[in-house]
Each structure stands twice: as structure tokens, then as C-alpha cells.
Amino acid sequence: MTIRILPPQLANQIAAGEVVERPASVIKELVENSLDAGATRVDIEIDKGGSKLIKITDNGSGIPKEELSLALSRHATSKLASLDDLDAILSFGFRGEALASISSVSRLTLTSRTQEQSEAWQAYAEGSEMAVRVIPAAHPVGSTVEAADLFFNTPARRRFLKSDKTEFTHIDEWLKRIALVRSEIHFTLKHNGKQVRNYRPAKTEAQYLQRLAQVSGKAFADNALRVDCNHNGLSLSGYIQSPFSEMAVGDTQYFYVNGRLVRDRLVNHAVRQAFAQQLQGEQVAFVLMLNLDPHQVDVNVHPAKHEVRFHESRYVHDFILQALESALRQSSELAFEAALDTQVTDQNRSASYIRPLQTQQSDTGSNQIAHGDTEENALWLANERPAYGEREASRQAGGQRVQETQMSSYGSGQSGGRGRSYASTELPSQAAVDSYAQLMTTPGVSSQANQADDSHLPPMPQVLDGQYWLLVRGSELALLSLSCAAREVTRREIEAKLDAGLIGQPLLMPVSVKVDEDWQQTLVERELLVRKLGLELTIRLGQLIIKKVPPYLRQSQLASVIPEFLQWIRFEEPTTEALVNWLVNQSGEQFNSASRLWAGLMGLPESQQQEILSLAKVMPWQTWLGEQTSE
């Protein structure tokens, strides 16, 4: 067979094999033409999934009469004039193949009118008959394209079409994609005479979120994180899935480059890497729009324009990664601050929450010890630690880099930072030995309300060096460690509450830990035990979400403590004594002042009070006093 130039109709049908895959492909090409023409409204009508009829109506600029026939010719376009234009293309179409290819496999009617024309004109082409007839018609400014009987002259192609429902699904999915990136356009879709989609123009962020909810679901729109980043000619905007969302957000994954939906492995890798700590191995939902200089991206690398090539791919990858990581960090900080504000506001309305974080200040003045340098000789209460526990655990588990602030909470312990808590002191008794003046003091109460509440309690022993109670037993003095007393008071409290079940306290921010394959079964088998301890644990998207814990675990590193606990109870159900010991060990000390510790001790039954007080160690005070006097 000799080499020859193909007839135009045959060449168009071959090209249609690339351009026209199914009805959704026709709609894509025609709607993109409408958008390139500046339309602000596009109405789509289809019958039988698009195989019977596809009709696109827009209010764009229209096509002049003398160009109607040319519009249906192959390689005819208004988008390009030179190779330089191709390097900086911003329009959807530019090859001039769509209308010619569609008209070669359907009965196509193109009706259009420009603002300058007094009447509209209509062009008609059918299958292999490439001659185009142009006649007058009635039509407002804009264009209407009808493609009837798709693949009527290529039975083999028609047999490959799926059911009407399947073809409609493909059309609907494509419309969702374009509706998100061109939110200023009013889109409607009718199927078999019934309107099924109506995407109204979105000119504000609130309106865009409504469209986002229409397309991607309310769960994603309500929990999505806003992304908006600009740097050195690159701009990334849109929404990403919140790593703390508890609801399924679907499989929304749309990425646009200069308004064009693309599928790119580089982009997907950057998104997965940004979420590596939060949702390991899971699909991430996102709607992201990247804008950059069109000279820096090549869109002419795929027949359907689904792929692009970035001239500086590594730079684009790093920009996307850093923009998403920044959005995740900022959202974590805002979530923490909002949760903290809520907790402070609700502190007097919910007994199930611990008291809010607060910074204590020293109160010197009239309550200073009148011996030597008061600032150096005054006795301070036991050290306190800032409430970093749960925040640090959440930060390590979720990859958040929240700027820590110096705030104090209850108790002292070994994890997290340690701070110094200052409280006012009262003058010692005049009858006290002078050598005790620098060592002993009774902590003052921070408010009149506390004084009223504690007025019925027996007098608290004096505090020695901020670490011990000094107890008098007849002619003997005994020292009781405040940390030891705090642990024992906590132990008795847990023992009293555990049988009825502990009350879980919501965390400021849920802690997420990568799940182990055996945890699901463990949670099912030990459900009653987990509830009894006040724990609320759920498994979602390959992550264990820690939502509530008893107050005794608030200061622990939950990201490691809870997995160790699940591993412990996996093979055996612990005894009550073992659970109590575990909670006590994890709790640290739940008191930030000797006065509160004393109030807690006095709230126990008298027998338990005596058990704890009996732990004090006798101090040979006569020997100690003799040593001090001899000096």
C-alpha cells in the first residue's frame, strides 16, 4: 500500500478516538470552549447518559458568522497564533481538534451570535459529510452546541459505551471538578429533562464553602483546612482534610494548575509527605489550586491534557510541601488556642474538667519573713511543672510545632519542663526557735474563698523546705514527704472511684497514634475495662484517636502510655490493685500546693488519714537543734 494523505473525514474520526472517548469527553471539550469564550453561565442538557443528546448553552462572546464553518474545521483555533503563544497558554483549548472530531462522530449543530450581530447563525455538520451548512437562527448572545446520536456512524465505538447511569456518573464527576475551580460560573445540568445539578456562582468564601459541600460533601467542607500561600511567583490555595476530623470525608482529590485539573505524581507525593505524620498510609482529601507563570509549565504533554510538566519540578514540590505543612501547623495552634479558651470559659460549669492552667505570682510585702534577706530566706512551696504533658504528646503524635508558653498546672513530676511556683508566706510564731525561721513557713491561701472553704479543716502542719510537713508527735518531730502524701491521697481517691468507673475528661486536642493491627480486637475484648477507666479510644483511617482520659493521665505522655496500656491488657485483664498502681504511677502529683494537699488528705476517712500520716519519719530534733545552736 502506498503512502497517502488521509481524507479529512477519516482523519477527524481517527482524532476523535483520542478526543471523544465517551459522552463526558464531549461535554468536557464543549464546556471548556464556553469558558474560554468568557461565559458566566453554562447550561448542560443530556439525554440517555449523553448518547442520545448533548446540548451546551452559554452566554459567552459567541462566534461571528464568517467563522462558523471554520470553527468546525480541523486545527482551527482562536487561542494560538505562534509557538510563543503555546509556551504561555492559559486557555483550556488550543489544538483546534475538538469540534471537528465531535462533528465527525455525531450530528452536530452550532448556533451562535456575537454582540455586534443583529441575528444569530447556525452551522450543521453530520458525520462524514464535512460540508457545513450555515443558516439564520434565533439565539441570544452566546452559543449553543448540540451533539446528537453520538457514534451513530461508528457502531463499534457505540457498543463500548456503558449504561446510561454509568455515563451520567462520568459526566457528573467531571462537572464537579470544573465547578470547584471555576466557582464564579453558574453551572446547571439536566438529565432526561430533569435538572439534577445547579451550582450557583460563588463570589465569597462562604458561598464557595457551600459549593464545596455540594461537590465534596458536608463532612469535608465543615472540617477542611484553608490553604493560602504565595512565594516567589507561586500561589497555592484551596482546602485540605483536617487530620483531626472524626468523619469520613470521601475521596475528594482535585489538583489544578492554572485552572486546569491535572493528575501528577509529583503533586501527590508532596501531599502524602505533608500528611505523613497524621494519616500514615491513608488517602487524603484535598482541593488545591496552584497558579504560576505559564512559561514554567508545559500543558501540551498529554492528548487529554491530564498531565503537565513543571520546568522546576523540585522547587514546585517543595513549595507545595511547605505550604501544606504550614497550614497544618497553624491549624493545630488555632485549635489548641480555641480549645484552651473554651476550657477556661467553662471551668466553673463543668466539674468533669480539671481547673484551667494558671500562672501563680509571688506575693511578697506584708507576708515576708522578718529575718535577714527576705527574698533569699523565704520558703517556697514545692516545684510545679507546666502542663506540657498532653500538649507535648499531641504535638509529637501529630507533627505539630506549637509554640509553648510558660503556664503552670497541678502537681509535680518528671516529664515536661519544670517551673518554680511562688506563694505568699505568713510570719512564723514568735515562740518558734530562731534557727527554724529560715526553714519553716505555713503557705498562705490564695483567696478569701479558699480561706472560707478551708476554715473547717484542722490546722495544717508547717512546711519544711517546701518538701515536707513537720508533724509533732508528743515530744517527737516527724517529716512527711509532700510527694509521698500526694501519691497516697491519689491512690485512695482512685480506689474509691474505680469500682463505679472513672469520669473521662476531653482532651484539648485529640492525640493520634499509628494503630497496631491487634488494637481493634483488644478494644472489643476489653471494652468494659476501657470504659471503666474513663478512656474514649477510636480507630479511624489507621490511627488510634485518644479523645478522653481520666484526670490521672492528663499529665502523662499519652502517645506512648496508651499503646503500652493496650499491649498490657491484650493478654490479661489486670487486677484492681494493678490498675490502681498503674494510674498512680502515671498521675504524678495532683496537687500544686501544700494547702490543697492537706485539704485532700482531710477529705479522706480518718483511718486512711492516719495511715498516710503514719508514713512520716521521726526526726531527732534535739540532736538537730543542738547542732544548729553550736554553730
Swiss-Prot record:
Pfam families: DNA_mis_repair, HATPase_c_3, MutL_C
GO MF entries: ATP binding; ATP hydrolysis activity; ATP-dependent DNA damage sensor activity; mismatched DNA binding
Keyword annotations of the record: DNA damage, DNA repair
Chain intervals for the UniProt region annotation (Disordered): 389-423
Domain of life: Bacteria
GO process terms (BP): mismatch repair
Gene3D superfamilies assigned to the protein according to its UniProt record, in alphabetical order: 3.30.230.10, Histidine kinase-like ATPase, C-terminal domain, MutL, C-terminal domain, regulatory subdomain
GO cellular component: mismatch repair complex
Protein family: Belongs to the DNA mismatch repair MutL/HexB family.
Function: This protein is involved in the repair of mismatches in DNA. It is required for dam-dependent methyl-directed DNA mismatch repair. May act as a 'molecular matchmaker', a protein that promotes the formation of a stable complex between two or more DNA-binding proteins in an ATP-dependent manner without itself being part of a final effector complex.
Protein's name in the database: DNA mismatch repair protein MutL
